[in-house]
Amino acid sequence: MQLFHGYIKNDRFHLHEHEINHCVRVLRKQVGDTIHFITGNGPLYQGHIQFASKQMVSGNFELIEERFGNFNYDLTVAIAPTKQMDRMEWFVEKAVEMGITRIIPILCDHSERRILKPGRLEKIALSATKQSLKGALVSISPLITFSEFIESRTSGYIAHCDLGIKQSFKDQIANQTGPITIMIGPEGDFSQKEIQWAVKKGIMPVDLGKSRLRTETAALVAVATLYQKHL
């Protein structure tokens, strides 16, 4: 199934500008053709093209599925962006394929990347959403500081490499219902101050297995653990 990204206005569907060229010039869609599209809010629609040009594709539509490709869980990953952007991009793509609700980039004491432009990540997320046949787009927040993130939290998990008592993330979520949030630190790990602050806020220290993982690998393991639970 070929999916397009569109929006609904005045009871008609319209394709976003970045989709028009592929629809009209590459796939040669024209008036009378039928396409499938998502708006990013969850549903799958079928659109019937009534107007097609290099500037606009629009028509009437019908709802096909209310929660298209959506999973029955809510997962937030708060992650320190990797120094190399291709690693962060890889994580976003794979996490979207397996099902993630939101990604919150956080700036930590040991962060190597301190500036993040979300535009490229949003494009990758959209492409992965369409490729993996999902109706809801992942939310990617602007980069915020560790303190800004932690102040609004009273529960969740923090995965770190420091010695000390930690629970298994897999075991902790085995019977958990409701939204899940996990924090993944930079290559240099969270600082002692950050770990202690998180614990004081009620965030549980967890491990993701015996291996020491790179940031993007650890984040994806967390996503895969929840994905596997719901298969």
Segments (PLM) and residue ranges:
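Short amphipathic alpha-helix with an adjacent loop that forms part of the alpha/beta core around
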Residues: 149-152, 169-175
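Short, acidic/turn-prone active-site loops that include or flank metal/cofactor-
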Residues: 164, 187-188, 210-213
